[in-house]
């Protein structure tokens, strides 16, 4: 009986499986965290590109009747992977914020600055833990000279 007990104590069978079971949750947490961060970074790049497309569209909209509508449409078209209902857009022309076509039309003067700021909510939840409990918001801003 003593010899079988000694053999059991000295045996290394199953040690690798136990070590793997101990380290697996840590590895999964790191892997899922990398995935979440990658998704947030991808969303940020798409949002930045959408803001740039919107600012360019706005800067080239002098002389058209729908500069604000064209700008928001360009932003939504440039962000196909994002939920466009959650994208918040702020359009500023010549220092004045505009939220309609008529408001933008009066301020679109050649040589002035057209600025588009976009924001989008993000989620940083990894394995049930929210790493941004107060909320995470991605934002991008681009300015162009009105042509």
Map each language-model feature to its residues.
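Alpha-helical assembly-interface signal, strongest on the long, hydrophobic N-terminal helix that forms
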Residues: 1-78
């Amino acid at each position: 009986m003593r010899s079988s007990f000694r053999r059991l104590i000295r045996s290394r069978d199953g040690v690798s499986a136990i070590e793997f079971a101990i380290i697996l949750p840590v590895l999964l947490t790191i892997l899922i965290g990398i995935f979440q961060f990658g998704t947030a970074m991808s969303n940020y790049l798409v949002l930045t590109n959408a803001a740039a497309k919107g600012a360019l569209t706005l800067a080239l909209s002098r002389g058209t009747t729908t500069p604000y509508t064209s700008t928001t449409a360009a932003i939504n078209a440039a962000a196909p992977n994002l939920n466009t209902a959650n994208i918040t857009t702020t359009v500023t022309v010549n220092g004045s914020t505009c939220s309609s076509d008529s408001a933008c039309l009066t301020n679109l003067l050649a040589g002035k600055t057209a600025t588009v700021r976009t924001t989008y909510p993000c989620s940083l939840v990894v394995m049930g833990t929210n790493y941004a409990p107060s909320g995470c918001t991605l934002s991008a801003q681009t300015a162009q000279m009105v042509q």
